[in-house]
Amino acid sequence: MPKLLYFPLHGRALKIRMLCKHANIAISDENPGKGDWKEWADLKQEFPDRGGLPWFINDDGKVFTQSDAILKTLALQAGYKCDDPWQQFESEWCFETANDYMKKDGILTPFFSPAFGGPEATEE
């Protein structure tokens, strides 16, 4: 069974989990940091060029990284490719709106907000 590795948070893996649920793609949703983080440290050494989480590891052991790349790859695998340009636009619009939410109003806001010790906002 494919594995989705991410922290025990919604975060950047939420869209992947939602797609897998909707497309009936069975995954093992795993927290590699459970316990002493040894599993995560071992994986990072095995795949040093893969960056941070989330990771999607398919049945043959291939490691996919970058949440949006994982999401788009799984969407193609699940048959969520639009032939109609308008439907494709709506699909991309939903995708990008979700990204905007994550960046501006979602879970990442507290980490970058001056109110929570993040950098001061600048007017452009």
Label for each model-derived stretch:
Residues 1-123:
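GST-like domain detector, emphasizing the conserved glutathione-binding G-site
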